[in-house]
Amino acid sequence: MPQMAGLPWLGNLLPMGADPLDFLMRTARRFPDLVYVRILGSGYIQVNDPHLIEEVLVTRSGSFIKDKDLKVYARAVFGNGLLSSDGEFWLRQRRLAQPAFHRERIAGYADLIREHTAQAMASWRVGEVRDVHVDMMETTLKIVAHALFGAQKDESIVEIGECLDTIMARFDFRGLTVLLEQALGRVIDRAKHERYEAAVRRLDAIVDGVIDRSRKDVHQADHLLAMLIAARDEDGSAMSDAQLRDESKTMFIAGHETTALSLSWTFWLLALNRDAHLRLREELRRVLDGRAPEMADLPKLTYTDQVIRESMRLMPPAWSIQREALMDVDIGGYQIPKGTNVLLSQYAVHRDPRFFRDPESFRPERWTPEFTRQLPKYAYFPFGGGPRLCIGQQFAQMEAVLMLAMIVQRFDMELVAGQRIVPQPSITMRPKYGLRMRLRAAE
């Protein structure tokens, strides 16, 4: 197996810590199959070939579990939720949660998405400068709070958002803190860690309160938490309060981060690519003529869907997946020893020139049915894959298309000059300094 050269003991800590995304990209170009990368006396295997990625996520998925180091961090926040659990427990939780994400159930949330998007836009004014990232995070948080818990007071939603921001900041992979803490097994930034622990405790208390209230009216309620409370496994068992809390927190993060970031990066890319913006607006004018989109419109909004796909190719909210070999395993003729960490980077693979012509360019029109058919399946995997494919994928895709269609019909977004746009690889890939845009009336 090829190995990346590095410094004694430090290995590749410095370039990985300084700019993880750039390091992953350069590594993928140099080693198109896979490569062993050393960091602080340990290391991981970066897998870059789509067919090998498919072996890890699908063909040999039973030979891998969630990466141990990441799981320790994730479990401190999400407990034993779908994001951080493994094995039979994960399978049981997935079975219990799956009915809440059936296609018919998801379609029922279209009105909720339109309602909250319209409410957000009602407060926007032509000519003002807004942080679009903040707006998208707030709007999708309200949507997922309503879908998960039913109608909630705005103050509670704001407090949940503040807790999540503090928690997500703890997982920033830009800089060396997280890598060093993993290697040394102890906390370095004590003040940041204390803020994080306080946010976790407060989030737990808020969610516990909602669960307690929801149990009292579970038969009258029509939201995801009520479905989870009522769900029964094959043996008749239900989720405990702790399990409900863990899954609720997991769905909060997964349910609003992916769409909010997808839309934030989409508005940035559209602001930089005027031709794509004009083509998008023309499709919306032709199909919708100024009205809010319905579920029946989605098959007709082909370019709108292509815009979202291309945005998630270049700027995937989930920028990497990490696994650990549960046993000695052969992947494409390469021997991976038990206990070895494996990293799959959507950010790097989605920009591979072997599969994407002009990979650094924003070209939504590339996503024709013909192109999609010939593309190796795991050359593009923004929602992961295999048994652990994101349970909310259909919800996120529907939400992104509906919101984008509504907003672009009302507003043009012009990027404010002079700001730094820096992707921040945390659990998700956020814009570190936000995305300030000036609102213009759609022509």
Please give the residue ranges for each predicted region.
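Cytochrome P450 catalytic-core helices
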Residues: 258-283, 394-409
